[in-house]
Amino acid sequence: MSRIPLGKVLLRNVIRHTDAHNKIQEESDMWKIRELEKQMEDAYRGTKRKMLPSSSSRMRSDGFDEESQRYYWRPKNEISGTLEDDFLKAKSWNKKFYDYEANMPDRWGHSGYKELYPEEFETDSDQQDITNGKKTSPQVKSSTHESRKHKKSKKSHKKKQKKRSHKKQKKSKKEATDITADSSSEFSEETGASGTRKGKQPHKRKKKSRKKSLKKPALFLEAESNTSHSDDSASSSSEESEERDTKKTKRKKREKKAHTSVANNEIQERTNKRTNWKVATDERSAESSEDD
């Protein structure tokens, strides 16, 4: 047998060693990728499992270091735990939110949006009821509500005007009564002063007892004259107001009669013109026929 040279043996050994090393490296890389995939699945599914690789699942070949592999997987496990916790918290909060939304009575529409756009929330049954007359549409309701408000505002405005006019009438009546009372008091004072002056001259020579007895009936007469004068002034003011009203009504009637008479005269003139025009045309036609 021929001997194999030493160089060729060394080359073969190097090739075998490199092949084995590459296989081991590829296998470790594949296991790393698989563990990362499992971590992602566990993070999204919320399952917990041990991430440290067991010694039985590893190939014990040349160049494999279990301690380095354990050191490599420690931070990965810590990161996966934090991710799982965050994912579980987010999932629980999402579940609570979904349950709250499912139990909401106004889930598919907002109340303010319903008020602004009620037509979009109407169903077929509501539309049928509206067409049959059982139900009123929201637009009709709003229009009726607005009309009622308008009517109420008109009524309140009329009531306010009536109250104001009534107050003005009361004020004018009070002013008239005050003026008449002042004038009657002034007139009574003047009459009383003149009466006392006249009564002093003939009674100078009489006794004091006579003067005292005469003072009381004089005051009583003055009060009676004042009351009678005030009554006369009030009655005279009421009579004056009635006379003014009657005068106004008479004037209005006269104006209406004059207007109607003028209108009747104009109508008669127009009719006369028309008849005269017809008569003139008839006469002209008769004259033309005679000439022929």
UniProtKB/Swiss-Prot annotation:
Residues 147-173, 197-215, 247-259 have a biased composition (Basic residues). Keywords: Isopeptide bond, Phosphoprotein, Ubl conjugation. Signal peptide: none annotated. The keyword Phosphoprotein applies. Residues 128-140, 180-194 have a biased composition (Polar residues). It holds the Pfam family NKAP. Residues 47-67, 122-292 are annotated as: Disordered. The keyword Coiled coil does not apply. Residues 280-292 have a biased composition (Basic and acidic residues). PANTHER family: NKAP DOMAIN CONTAINING 1 (PTHR46940:SF1), NKAP DOMAIN-CONTAINING 1 (PTHR46940). This is Uncharacterized protein NKAPD1. It comes from Homo sapiens (Human).
